[in-house]
Amino acid sequence: MAPRGRRRPRPHRSEGARRSKNTLERTHSMKDKAGQKCKPIDVFDFPDNSDVSSIGRLGENEKDEETYETFDPPLHSTAIYADEEEFSKHCGLSLSSTPPGKEAKRSSDTSGNEASEIESVKISAKKPGRKLRPISDDSESIEESDTRRKVKSAEKISTQRHEVIRTTASSELSEKPAESVTSKKTGPLSAQPSVEKENLAIESQSKTQKKGKISHDKRKKSRSKAIGSDTSDIVHIWCPEGMKTSDIKELNIVLPEFEKTHLEHQQRIESKVCKAAIATFYVNVKEQFIKMLKESQMLTNLKRKNAKMISDIEKKRQRMIEVQDELLRLEPQLKQLQTKYDELKERKSSLRNAAYFLSNLKQLYQDYSDVQAQEPNVKETYDSSSLPALLFKARTLLGAESHLRNINHQLEKLLDQG
């Protein structure tokens, strides 16, 4: 031990060492600032309360441990290796690139981080609809190593997720135990217990799904049984002849049920007096029911007939209104036709009278000619009854006399002038 009064002499450091230390501190501070600025650089979009923080912690551990490692990132973050051996080789190469003094520490850290990564894979498998965020291209050269490491961790997560899905599908098809699946699908030895937990979780999910299906089938069966029991129960209805299904009422169903309950109750009673009283009560009630049903049926029939008569009356009333409108429209035409009819009737009567007169006149002339032929030497005598005929015959003679008088008067005028 050194005495208290003495101070340890500081080792002399060269300017190159100081500069390298300053540059390292600057790079670390710039990395921290870049990590704070570029928060959306994570490949998967998880909620804040999920286990994605483990992925961030893995990236920070890799920052502290592997400042000099460089990886070539894949074409996209969801790249899958063709074979499990390729994945194990790649993991072996990445592990061999670390310095030998830090391999033990790295393996212990990765075993804890891979468990948290697989838990985050569970969440991402439940939400397959999430999309990847593009990695920003505007980051500086200092941030390139960090982004490559994060892409590498995302690649590991995606490969483990696809391997878990493949192994679960093969286990469902072949129905093999989960131990053989986990032994085939694990690459590094530290990830085996976490993958076994994953398989157990998937098996529990499949069991719960099967239980849900079984309960759904049971519900379907119970529903079908209930429907079958409902269909097996037949409802008896009392309906008289000529009754329609639309006229069925509550009493039509109550009466058969009343008869059924009466029979059941009568079988349980042993006293004759009670049976007689129940029988009389049953008969009276049944008669009342039947009377009410008949009266209700009669009432429905009367209502139906009344409705039919009302509809017929309404139709006839409508037709009467139409006829009245038509009569009002044809009334002037009727008047015109009536006047024409009266005129034609008068003409017909006048023509009939004229024809009768002419026939009588012809008969009279025929009689006169016959008498004159039989007695030609007898002188004709005319009485007062034949005066109109004589005037009619003398009209021509009177006309000739007046004509001669006119001629004589004109000749006298001419002579006087001359």
From Swiss-Prot:
CC per GO annotation: centriolar satellite; cytosol; inner kinetochore; nucleoplasm; nucleus
The UniProt-reported impact of residue 78 to A is:
Insensitive to PLK1-induced degradation
UniProt keyword Ion transport, yes or no: no
Q: Residue positions of the PTM Phosphothreonine? A: 78, 98, 110
Q: Where is this cross-link: Glycyl lysine isopeptide (Lys-Gly) (interchain with G-Cter in SUMO2)?
A: 185
Post-translational modification summary for this protein: Phosphorylated by PLK1 at Thr-78, creating a self-tethering site that specifically interacts with the polo-box domain of PLK1.
- The name this protein carries in UniProt is Centromere protein U
Query: To which species is this protein native?
Result: Homo sapiens
Cite the entry's keywords alphabetically.
Centromere, Chromosome, Coiled coil, Cytoplasm, Host-virus interaction, Isopeptide bond, Kinetochore, Nucleus, Phosphoprotein, Repressor, Transcription, Transcription regulation, Ubl conjugation
- Annotated Pfam families: CENP-U
Write out the annotated subcellular location. Answer: Cytoplasm; Nucleus; Chromosome, Centromere, Kinetochore
Protein's GO biological process:
chordate embryonic development; chromosome segregation
- UniProt key word ATP-binding: no
Record-stated family: Belongs to the CENP-U/AME1 family.
Q: Compositional bias (Polar residues) spans? A: 180-193
* Motif Nuclear localization signal positions after renumbering to this chain: 6-23, 303-320
List-wise, which residues carry Phosphoserine? 108, 111, 116, 120, 136, 139, 141, 190, 194, 232
Basic and acidic residues bias spans: 12-42, 145-165
The record's region (Disordered) falls at 1-76, 88-227
Q: Which InterPro entries does the annotation name?
A: CENP-U
Q: Which residues form a coiled coil?
A: 297-356, 397-417
Tissue specificity field: Expressed at high levels in the testis, fetal liver, thymus, bone marrow and at lower levels in the lymph nodes, placenta, colon and spleen. Present in all cell lines examined, including B-cells, T-cells, epithelial cells and fibroblast cells. Expressed at high levels in glioblastoma cell lines.
Protein's gene = CENPU
What's this protein's function?
A: Component of the CENPA-NAC (nucleosome-associated) complex, a complex that plays a central role in assembly of kinetochore proteins, mitotic progression and chromosome segregation. The CENPA-NAC complex recruits the CENPA-CAD (nucleosome distal) complex and may be involved in incorporation of newly synthesized CENPA into centromeres. Plays an important role in the correct PLK1 localization to the mitotic kinetochores. A scaffold protein responsible for the initial recruitment and maintenance of the kinetochore PLK1 population until its degradation. Involved in transcriptional repression.
Top-level lineage group: Eukaryota
